[in-house]
């Protein structure tokens, strides 16, 4: 009624969405000239625009106003302004489109749509600020129909919507394609009684059209038109026998709406010829800022007459034979999502307005596959927040300390039997599924670590960083004279010290202290000849931290060797992630290339441990030639197959001392490439037997059997990601093909190399120093060099030192955390500047923006990257505010953990969460709510609303309710989960 009253008064209206950011609404109102009245609905708070010539009036106040007769009120004409709608603008500001009365009259002519039902009752589901809402209202009201206004929350609930449709006898509807797709799943009953369904606002999926035709009893029309041409300008009533060639047709222009396809010279294009779609009759007056009209509102000559037209930027053609219009995409960076038109430039400008954003770009992904929604992905280059790096480093170190103290070693005194000390393997779980690693495999792993550490010698004085439960300490040779250990867990330190005191072998020789790796200088004067880090480096926060620790240790005069065991390899990490992805997805058809690619990216984004390449250690000799004599990079010598063997290695740093142990060189041209020569086990053995008199035989690029399959998986993913290739095989068939190809190529394990050497009469040294350049392959030197007093002979293997920047030799988990926070900050900023539908669900922070050969942003490359991103997990629609006491408590504790306000609809990982923060959050929840909840619960239910359900279920199991009263008194403080929450 207000809209029609405004039009009858020869005034114009401007619809606003109360859910839009105040800043955006203020921008819109500021661009409108003249006196403005803003009518507010019941319950809407005063936004405080503070603009001159602006009056705020509550709709309820107008009901009591006494209206005087207005004399000589001018009547509106066909060219009077009817309304102004603001759409996304490429300049970064919304642009207002002025629509005249004639466009409305043109639009609501009933003969535009044949078989129009009578009586007609039309659902009003569109946002009032969307121009589709004007058609819902005026088409019905001006044709004698009824408009049924439906609450926003009801439009999100299929059952509720169907109930409203049935109760109000709705028989006409106008839906955006995305809404229809939702209702085809959740509100099928609502569609069955429709005599007319119009679908428009974005591209109509023909699969949805075909399915809707099986439900809707009346006609279905595909309607099309930009805001500038009065919302709807073409219509295609879909016939029952439609074949959907080239998608759903746009049809023909409606009453008084000229629709033309023009070539670049503004001449009419012939049938079947691509061109730009222009509208003539019925176009709007123009933009509120006249300078924006250029190249959009233009004059064209049609059949000798000058016609004012609007260029849509849509790529079209008129079909040969019947002249029906067909849509083939955009000519610019404008697109539609969920019926809303979006200029990529406006979103990019909004992102660039954030102080940390240096560059920004928007691309689209999805929309091609059945049921797949079109989705925006934002890419930004952000300025590093240097002020937080030192603080984050400290937080990461403290986080691991909390993890060990309150997690892994919290129950060490009772969980580890005295007879198992040194072989307890507490906390050693598989990264594939979280289950304990087989004890036999763990024992083989430990035996190999001790054998490599001893190297045929007896270490006399040992310093260990990260004693843990004492696995290294209690397996050292009897010749040990002194041992000093450091560990961040007080519980573990007390446990090991008690075990030392009760052991005649170690009592009086060993002592463990609470401390971090950087606390060595606090231990007083030390004289270790061997320093041990075993399975510790991954917990260091940054490469710089690791460098600082190593530099401090090599400065101790007595140190001869630094043993760094169980290092997670950065070079082969993608192989490992591929293995985890396939394990998660299964070997059936779920493991398609796209899903594996996305899962790999998801796992990589969640990584919180430090991964280091071998070159990080081999470059120590170049960086400190005065101190470092040699660096070995040694793969695990084990028969078992698990992630500890396949994706970890040992680095042994030998420092210069008075001993004269030689390091044997290898000639660059003497290496035989195992893969290039297509060798196998037999061919290698034969070659060695023929070379039995040689001092050494160097073989490079030996495919590592433990990772060969995963390596080929990654190669296959990379091959396809370089272009737009689609999966030609299902998941199971693809994996089977890769496995067959892997099995057709020869590969070897480290034990097999030792067996071959033994059979051929050689000794062998194996190196993993070139994991990066050789894609995980190994080097081996079979030799007859003179034996020394050690098990291994030092050989100068080739390295990757010259091929890599030092910045790429390790990952930076803290940097990922900072980037996630930067993305979160930009998202929060966007939410205050643009409507929700313009906020990309995925915002990715890049080091640099990729450029094409013209020096412009390479959007094709960004689109390729966007395809690999994991789909964001989101909760079902729930209010942002917590409802129950449990949710309030959860949000409070999460806010403390993250240091920022957390809402119940937030996602743990999208906020930058990882297992350390999960451990901290769980600890706080357990203390506050006295409920058993695990880190796995957080990982399985990362949306806080879903996690609250898990907590509620845990409380219910612990404290069954008797006669409405929880044993812990929680029933008085915890409200039952509401229907809104469940929705």
UniProtKB/Swiss-Prot annotation:
Cofactor: how bound: Binds 6 phosphopantetheines covalently.
Region (Adenylation): 5-338
Keywords from the named record: Ligase, Methyltransferase, Multifunctional enzyme, Phosphopantetheine, Phosphoprotein, Repeat, Transferase
Positions carrying O-(pantetheine 4'-phosphoryl)serine: 915
GO biological process entries: amino acid activation for nonribosomal peptide biosynthetic process; enniatin biosynthetic process; methylation; secondary metabolite biosynthetic process
Keyword Magnesium: no
Pathways per UniProt: Antibiotic biosynthesis; enniatin biosynthesis
Named cofactor requirement(s): pantetheine 4'-phosphate
Region of interest (S-adenosyl-L-methionine-dependent N-methyltransferase), ranges: 398-554
PROSITE patterns associated with the record: AMP_BINDING (PS00455), CARRIER (PS50075), PHOSPHOPANTETHEINE (PS00012)
Biotechnology: Enniatins have antimicrobial, antiviral and cytotoxic properties. The bioactivity of enniatins can be linked to their inhibition of drug efflux pumps.
A molecular-function term among this protein's GO annotations: S-adenosylmethionine-dependent methyltransferase activity
Entry EC no(s): 6.3.2.-, 2.1.1.-
GO cellular component terms, semicolon-separated: cytoplasm
Residue ranges of coiled coil: none
Residues annotated as domain Carrier: 881-955
Spans annotated as Disordered: 961-983
Function recorded in the entry: Nonribosomal peptide synthetase that synthesizes enniatin by coupling three D-hydroxycarboxylic acids and three L-amino acids via amide and ester bonds in an alternating fashion. Whereas ESYN1 can accept different amino acids as precursors (L -valine, L-isoleucine or L-leucine), only one species of D-hydroxycarboxylic acid can be found in natural enniatin isolates (D-hydroxyisovaleric acid, D-Hiv). D-Hiv stems from L-valine deanimation by a valine aminotransferase to 2-keto-isovaleric acid (2-Kiv), which becomes subsequently reduced by a keto-isovaleric acid reductase (KivR) to D-Hiv.
The record's note on its domains: NRP synthetases are composed of discrete domains (adenylation (A), thiolation (T) or peptidyl carrier protein (PCP) and condensation (C) domains) which when grouped together are referred to as a single module. Each module is responsible for the recognition (via the A domain) and incorporation of a single amino acid into the growing peptide product. Thus, an NRP synthetase is generally composed of one or more modules and can terminate in a thioesterase domain (TE) that releases the newly synthesized peptide from the enzyme.
Family membership: Belongs to the ATP-dependent AMP-binding enzyme family.
The protein's name in its UniProt record: Enniatin synthase
Species for this entry: Gibberella pulicaris
């Amino acid at each position: 009624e207000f809209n029609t009253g405004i039009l009858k008064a020869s005034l114009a209206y401007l619809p606003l969405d109360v859910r839009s950011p105040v800043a955006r609404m203020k921008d819109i109102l500021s661009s409108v000239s003249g006196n403005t009245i803003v009518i507010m609905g019941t319950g809407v708070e005063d936004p405080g625009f503070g603009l001159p010539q602006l009056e705020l009036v509550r709709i309820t106040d107008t009901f009591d106003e006494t209206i005087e007769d207005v004399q000589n009120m001018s009547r509106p004409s066909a060219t009077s302004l009817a309304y102004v709608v603001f759409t996304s603008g490429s300049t970064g500001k919304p642009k207002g489109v002025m629509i005249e009365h004639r466009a409305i009259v043109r639009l609501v002519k009933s003969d535009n749509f044949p078989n129009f039902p009578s009586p007609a009752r039309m659902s009003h589901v569109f946002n009032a600020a969307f121009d589709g809402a004007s058609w819902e209202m005026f088409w019905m009201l001006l044709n004698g129909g009824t408009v049924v206004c439906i609450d926003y929350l009801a439009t999100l609930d299929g059952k509720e919507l169907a109930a409203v449709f049935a109760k109000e006898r709705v028989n006409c509807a106008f839906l955006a394609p995305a809404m229809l797709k939702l209702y085809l799943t959740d509100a099928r009953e609502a569609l069955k009684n429709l005599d007319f369904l119009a679908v428009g606002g974005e591209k109509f999926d023909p699969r949805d059209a075909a399915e809707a035709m099986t439900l809707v009893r009346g006609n279905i029309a595909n309607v099309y038109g930009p805001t500038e041409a009065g919302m709807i300008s073409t219509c295609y009533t879909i016939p029952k026998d439609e074949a959907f060639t080239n998608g759903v047709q746009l049809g023909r222009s409606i009453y008084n709406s000229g629709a033309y396809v023009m070539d670049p010279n503004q001449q009419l294009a012939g049938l079947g010829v691509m061109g730009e779609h222009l509208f003539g009759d019925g176009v709007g007056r123009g933009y509120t800022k006249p300078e924006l009209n250029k190249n959009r509102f233009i004059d064209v000559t049609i059949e000798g007459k000058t016609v004012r037209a609007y260029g849509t930027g849509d790529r079209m053609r008129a079909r040969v034979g019947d002249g029906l219009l067909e849509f083939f995409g955009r000519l610019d960076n404008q697109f539609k999502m969920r019926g809303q038109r979006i200029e990529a430039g406006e979103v990019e400008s909004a992102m660039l307005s954030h102080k940390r954003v240096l560059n920004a770009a928007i691309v689209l992904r999805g929309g091609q596959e059945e049921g797949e929604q079109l989705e925006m992905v934002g890419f930004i280059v952000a300025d590093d927040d240097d002020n937080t790096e030192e603080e984050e480093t400290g937080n990461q170190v403290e986080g691991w300390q909390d993890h060990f103290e309150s997690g892994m070693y919290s129950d060490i005194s009772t969980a580890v039997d005295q007879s198992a000390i040194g072989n307890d393997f507490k906390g050693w779980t598989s990264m594939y599924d979280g289950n304990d690693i087989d004890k036999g495999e763990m024992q083989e792993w430990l035996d190999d670590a001790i054998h490599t550490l001893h190297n045929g010698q007896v270490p006399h004085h040992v310093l260990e960083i990260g004693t843990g439960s004492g696995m290294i300490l209690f397996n050292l040779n009897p010749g040990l004279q002194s041992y000093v250990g450091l560990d961040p867990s007080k519980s573990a330190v007390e446990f090991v010290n008690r075990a030392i005191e009760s052991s005649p072998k170690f009592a009086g020789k060993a002592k463990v202290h609470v401390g971090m790796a950087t606390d060595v200088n606090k231990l007083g004067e030390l004289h270790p000849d061997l320093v041990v880090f075993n399975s510790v480096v991954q917990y260091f926060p940054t490469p710089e931290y690791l460098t600082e620790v190593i530099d401090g240790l090599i400065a101790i005069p007595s140190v001869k060797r630094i043993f760094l065991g169980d290092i997670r390899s950065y070079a082969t990490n993608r192989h490992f992630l591929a293995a985890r992805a396939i394990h998660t997805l299964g070997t059936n058809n779920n493991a398609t290339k796209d899903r594996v690619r996305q899962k790999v990216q998801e796992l990589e984004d969640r990584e919180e441990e430090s991964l280091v390449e071998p070159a990080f250690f081999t470059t120590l000799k170049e960086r400190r030639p005065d101190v470092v004599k040699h660096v070995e990079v040694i793969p695990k010598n084990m028969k078992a197959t698990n992630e500890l063997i396949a994706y970890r290695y040992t680095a042994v740093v030998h420092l210069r001392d008075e001993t004269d142990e030689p390091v044997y060189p290898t000639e660059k041209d003497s290496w035989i490439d195992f893969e290039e020569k297509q060798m196998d086990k037999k061919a290698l053995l034969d070659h060695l037997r023929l070379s039995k008199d040689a001092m050494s035989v160097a073989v490079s690029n030996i495919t590592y059997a433990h990772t060969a399959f995963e390596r080929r998986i990654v190669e296959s993913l990379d091959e396809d990601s370089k272009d737009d290739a689609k999966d030609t095989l299902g998941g199971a068939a693809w994996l089977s093909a890769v496995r067959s190809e892997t099995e057709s190529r020869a590969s070897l394990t480290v034990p097999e190399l030792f067996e071959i050497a033994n059979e051929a009469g050689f000794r062998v040294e194996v190196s993993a120093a070139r994991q990066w350049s050789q894609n995980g392959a190994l080097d081996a030197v079979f030799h007859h060099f003179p034996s020394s007093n050690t098990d291994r002979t030092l050989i100068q293997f080739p390295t990757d030192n010259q091929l890599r920047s030092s910045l790429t030799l390790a990952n930076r988990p803290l940097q990922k955390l900072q980037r996630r926070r930067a993305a979160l900050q930009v998202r929060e900023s966007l939410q205050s500047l643009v409507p929700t539908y313009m906020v990309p669900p995925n915002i990715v922070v890049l080091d640099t923006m990729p450029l094409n050969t013209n020096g412009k942003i390479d959007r094709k490359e960004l689109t390729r990257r966007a395809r690999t991103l994991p789909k964001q997990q989101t909760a079902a629609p729930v209010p942002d505010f917590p409802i129950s006491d449990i949710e309030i408590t959860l949000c409070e504790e999460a806010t403390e953990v993250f240091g920022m306000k957390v809402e119940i609809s937030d996602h743990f990982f999208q906020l930058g969460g990882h297992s350390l923060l999960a451990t901290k959050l769980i600890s706080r929840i357990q203390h506050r709510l006295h409920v058993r909840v695990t880190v796995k619960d957080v990982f399985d239910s990362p949306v806080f609303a879903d996690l609250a359900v898990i907590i509620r279920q845990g409380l219910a199991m612990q404290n069954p309710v008797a006669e409405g009263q929880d044993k812990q008194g929680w029933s008085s403080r915890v409200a039952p989960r509401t229907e809104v929450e469940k929705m």
